[in-house]
Amino acid sequence: MVTLPIANDAATDIFAELDAKSIALLLDVDGTLIDIAPSPNEVHVADDLRDSLARLSRLTGGALALVSGRPIVDLDVLFAPFKLPAVGGHGAELRVREVISSAAPLPQDLRRHLAEAATPGSGIIVEDKGYSLALHYRNGPQHEDRLRQHIAAGRAAFPGEATEVLPGKAVLEVKRPNVNKGDGVRELMRHPPFAGRMPVFIGDDVTDESVFAVLPGLGGKGFSVGRHFAGLAGIFDSPIDVRRALQRLASSRQAQSS
């Protein structure tokens, strides 16, 4: 018999019982903390979410980090005025108190070639991160096959450059191989104030599978949003349920420590 993770309300109860003094809270952003928007620039971070993250950062002794496909500089803009520890760019960047590491950029010519897929009226949106390039087709789903062919041709035109394609929710991202969120989290957990704590991660997409995979070896717990992954402690229905769970955890621990 397959044991399924505990769903929404019960998962929220489990989450609320976590001991903030002993965990490292690791949070995906798009589709987890905030709702996915038609384009990456259209997302919104509400003040109550900022407040919950600020309180939880204090309660965990600073062991709260964002784990995102976005570059860290974009995360800083989204969550301003806070500059939280982060694994950015699907593991291409890591910051604890400063940017510790960053992957080598993809060649400009390759990025330019890939970006040519965003023809006028196609609905395809280019997100050039330097070390990777993401092509969002949420507004032009009919172009997915053409987009995959374009990416394959672009990679073939640069045989000396090792790349791989990371699929996500209506997005295809060309990046360096062996760069992923899981390895980024593993490295993050080596640094204070994360070292020695139990990592608790919430994610929603196939791009988060590498984190779920490393959690058992780190003694951690994983929660997902809207879909089932193996080995999880629970599943939240939607980002609003995640935000409510964070608010509940922040409030309960805040009350106990006051």
Predicted regions and their residues:
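Substrate-recognition "cap/lid" segment bordering the active-site pocket of phosphatases
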Residues: 87-113, 166-196
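Substrate-recognition/cap helix-loop segment adjacent to the acidic, metal-dependent catalytic center
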Residues: 70-89, 143-163
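A structural signal for isolated positions on well-ordered beta-strands in alpha/beta enzyme cores
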Residues: 24, 63-65, 164, 200, ...
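Active-site phosphate-binding/coordination module
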Residues: 44-131
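Charged, glycine-interspersed solvent-exposed loop segments at helix/strand-loop junctions
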Residues: 124-142, 163-175
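Mg2+-dependent phosphoryl-transfer enzymes with acidic/Ser/Thr/Gly-rich catalytic loops
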Residues: 2-8, 20, 46, 182-258
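Asp-based phosphoryl-transfer active-site loop
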Residues: 18-38, 66, 185
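Short amphipathic alpha-helices and their capping/turn segments at secondary-structure boundaries
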Residues: 5-21, 74-78
